[in-house]
Structures are given as C-alpha cells and as structure tokens.
Curated annotation (Swiss-Prot):
Keyword hit for Flavoprotein: no
Self-association state and partner proteins as the record states: Part of the 50S ribosomal subunit.
Coiled-coil region: none
Name of one Pfam family that matches: Ribosomal_L27A
Full protein name: Large ribosomal subunit protein uL15
Family, as annotated: Belongs to the universal ribosomal protein uL15 family.
Protein's gene: rplO
Keyword Ribonucleoprotein: yes
Amino acid sequence: MRLEDIRPQPGSTRRRRRLGRGIAAGQGASCGKGMRGQKARKGGGPRPGFEGGQTPLYRRLPKLKHFPRYVRRPQYTLINLRALAKLPAGSEVSLESLMDLGIVTTNDGPLKILGDGEVGVPLTIRAAAITPSARAKVEAAGGRVELVGSQTASAGS
C-alpha cells in the first residue's frame, strides 16, 4: 500500500456545491444568498455580536469584578431528614436507594443530608456530605453516618 492508494471510505465524502453555474445547477444566480445586502457580498456578514451599530449587549452589561467564591462549589442532591422519617429501622440510605424508592427523582450530584425534620429510627446513611445538625439527630436515634466519595473533606459543610 502506498500513500496515493489511500481513498476515503465510500459515502464519507460529498461533492462540493458549485455555486453560480446556472439555474439548472440548483445554486445558480444568487448562489443561495438571497437578494442583496451585506450578507450576500463576499466576506460574509458582520462579526458575531454586532447589533447594527446599537451598543451591543456585552458593552451594556457591567464589568465582572472578581470571581465569586461559589464558582467551584460542588452541586449536591439535597434532602432533609423529614423525607427519611418514613423509612423502616436499619435501612441503608444512599442516593441509589433513595432514587429506587422514589424519594429523590433527580440526580443533581452527590447526596447531602440536611437537618430539617426528625428521624426516630436508626438508619445507616451513606452520603457525600451531611450537616452537623443532621449528623447529631441521626446518631441520637442510634444510626450511623458514612461519608462516601471525594467530598469527605467538606463533611461538615
């Protein structure tokens, strides 16, 4: 095999459109560019973001001063203890088990347990993060908390 023997796969290439070669060619006369105007000339049209001389949006908006602290903050799937109150004693709580039960319907990221509500039965909670109040309520009911995933450093957040 030599370099000049290489051919593209059959059906992978299309013939280029020959513009302005007569009406019967399908792209004759104005070559599919409509009538007249800036967009019909060579060189295309105005640059992206040009609004015809009106002050463009990127100049009307205020400048962004420093970056906010929450730009790289991880997104969590949040759930309160109130939603876990109906679970039977000794059940394991994880994002997968909550989605199977229909308690959580969307996966927005790792699971984070918030402390609103009460839990009366011991539960084993496997979550990426848990608030201190939620941890205290779960452990007071006789449950355990296991931190999973890469978010173990921010366990108390």
